[in-house]
Amino acid sequence: LNKYIDEKIIINQLQLSITNTGMIDSGLNVNMKINSSIDRDGSILEYCRLKDITIQAWSPFQYGMFEGVFLDNDKFPELNNKINEIAAIKGVSNTAIATAWILRHPAKIQPIVGTTNQNRLKDICKASQINLTRQEWYEIYRAAGNKLP
């Protein structure tokens, strides 16, 4: 697309959440014969990083395309237990931790939170002050059912 337009593309909005990690999975599971090593996104994460295109994550609290929110959802007990455990340690909400998980990625991904509720927005903004450790980030990733090599 950049080849055919005058303006440089600087942002790409993509679905990404703790439960929608395809673009992350394929980069972690390189050269393996497992489902999560299949590149279904055309290496978009790596492409955007190389071309200085900011990824904006839409539906950062959703699982699937239209199924619903994973936070406080009975379908994700291990994930919610891990998020709530870290939230309690850091003194913030589970929403702030889910947002911080996206912000912690080295690609400097920007979440699009899509709320009009001022209190929820203030709560989400606390994520920018949370410093998830690498271990916490991977614990959350694994609690969502993702595997590491």
Which stretches of residues belong to each language-model region?
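Beta/alpha (TIM)-barrel catalytic core signal, keyed to glycine-rich beta->alpha loops juxtaposed to Asp/Glu
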Residues: 1-149
